[in-house]
From Swiss-Prot:
Keywords: Early protein. This is Protein MGF 100-3L. Belongs to the asfivirus MGF 100 family. It comes from the Viruses. Plays a role in virus cell tropism, and may be required for efficient virus replication in macrophages. Induction: Expressed in the early phase of the viral replicative cycle.
Length: 146
């Protein structure tokens, strides 16, 4: 499962915009945001891309709700994973909410080159992760050194 980049996300911490930008830039330097893994031309997951996704540490194939809930037990808030469905055509982001510890599930959809998360167009994950808060709340990262 994935987690915060360094576990340092504190939801009540007040940071200046400059500090937020610096923290975001440092985190971005340490990690490669994985929008290129997901963006593709059709609405279905291309086989080559799916192979790359399935190699990610935080990808778990075809887990049911009970299995996912058990996997998140005793995990810190912010922990996340990606999972698919039985058709291999849909991807879902599941994350333990930072505020109350409940599980959030978002469907990732593709239309042309745009990424939709629960129906909202983010065009790319880089746009989705444009703020420090988003980066830590939704830490979809791919470490190309692995």
């Amino acid at each position: 499962m994935g987690n915060h980049l360094d576990g340092s996300y504190l939801p009540n911490t007040v940071m200046s915009i400059e500090d937020k930008q610096n923290t975001y830039n440092e985190a971005k330097e340490d990690s490669k945001i994985c929008n290129k893994i997901y963006i593709k031309q059709s609405g279905k997951i291309d086989k080559k891309e799916l192979k790359r996704i399935k190699k990610l540490d935080f990808f778990y194939s075809q887990k049911n709700d009970d299995e996912i809930e058990r996997m998140f037990m005793n995990k810190p808030n912010g922990t996340f994973l990606l999972t698919d469905d039985a058709t291999d055509e849909n991807l879902f982001l599941v994350q333990k909410d930072l505020e109350n510890g409940s599980l959030n599930i978002a469907k990732l959809d593709f239309n042309g080159k745009a990424l939709y998360i629960n129906g909202k167009n983010y065009f790319s994950l880089e746009n989705y992760l444009k703020t420090v808060e988003d980066f830590y709340k939704y830490p979809l990262i791919y470490d190309e050194n692995k």
